[in-house]
Every structure is written in C-alpha cells, then in structure tokens.
C-alpha cells in the first residue's frame, strides 16, 4: 500500500497493511540524521522514516504583511512576527525570547486591524505543498489552537492572568 492508500483505508474503517504513522521532526533531528546516518542533504526525512501523513498549513497569523527583521547579527535575530510580537532568537537555539506582544493592554484588542484572511501570500506555501504531496500522501490541514494563538497575541503570563482575573476578556481574546 502507498501512504495515501494506507491512510484512506484507515479512515474508511478498512484494514491497512500497517497502522499509518505521523511524526513531526525538528530541524535539528533532520540534520542529525543526515550526519549520523549518512543520508543525502536533500533527503525527505518524512519519506525516509515512512511517515504516511503530511500537514499543510496556511499562514494563520493576523499580521503577515507586517513581519520585519528589526536587528540581526551573528549571534541573535530580532523580528516582528505575524502575531505582532517582537521576538529574539539566538543562533543554534530552538526557543525564543518574547520582547513585546500586540495586545499589551486590554484596550489594545479593540484597536487591532487584522490583515485580510484572503491575502494570496497566506496560501502560497500551503497550495504549493498540497500540490506537491497530494498524489502520494494524505494531506491534512491544520490551524493552531486557541490557547497558544492567544498567548502569541497577549503573552502567556498576561493571558493566564486574564483567565483568572477577567474571564470575560479572556473569552473575547481567545
């Protein structure tokens, strides 16, 4: 069975040749596999490990047109991302430092003007991936959940405080 046939069989409640698999590999894992297993640099790591599902994601950020690099040197990079946050990443580090969020004060929520959900740039990578994968894999779409996406707008500590102190605002924000 191909990956697509395997997933479709499972979704149709027919027995596949094996249980369909999915994983999400970090960039560092991919690089380690290339080095330690002697794989070619252009290896499709999902295909190599028999992953049966591909995930296509459109740009779900509220402000994709406002992203910009604010500062960059050999050690760190500071950007305004599509969530309106200012975040700093460090070379060879997976996590980031959040320096600023879009909804600093509760009143900021009423002043936000999101970019159109119909912007072509939101879907360019999504459409390219679906087209590339659809013949061989089952392609699933995803969006992020309300908790993480809300923390991106408000900041995690602020949002958790809002949940406890002002549940009505937290609901409006999420």
Language-model features: locations:
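Catalytic cores of TIM-barrel enzymes
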Residues: 1-174
């Amino acid at each position: 069975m191909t990956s697509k046939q395997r997933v479709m069989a499972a979704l149709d409640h027919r027995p596949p040749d094996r249980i369909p698999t999915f994983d999400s590999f970090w960039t560092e894992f991919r690089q380690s596999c290339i080095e330690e297993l002697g794989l070619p640099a252009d290896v499709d790591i999902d295909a190599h490990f028999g992953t049966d599902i591909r995930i296509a994601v459109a740009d779900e950020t509220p402000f994709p047109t406002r992203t910009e690099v604010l500062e960059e040197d050999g050690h760190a990079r500071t950007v305004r991302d599509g969530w309106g946050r200012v975040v700093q990443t460090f070379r060879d580090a997976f996590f980031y430092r959040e320096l600023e969020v879009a909804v600093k004060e509760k009143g900021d929520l009423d002043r936000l003007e999101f970019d159109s959900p119909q912007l072509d740039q939101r879907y360019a990578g999504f459409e390219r991936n679906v087209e590339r994968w659809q013949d061989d894999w089952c392609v699933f779409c995803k969006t992020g959940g309300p908790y993480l996406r809300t923390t991106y707008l408000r900041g995690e500590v602020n949002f958790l405080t809002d949940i406890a102190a002002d549940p009505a605002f937290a609901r409006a924000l999420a």
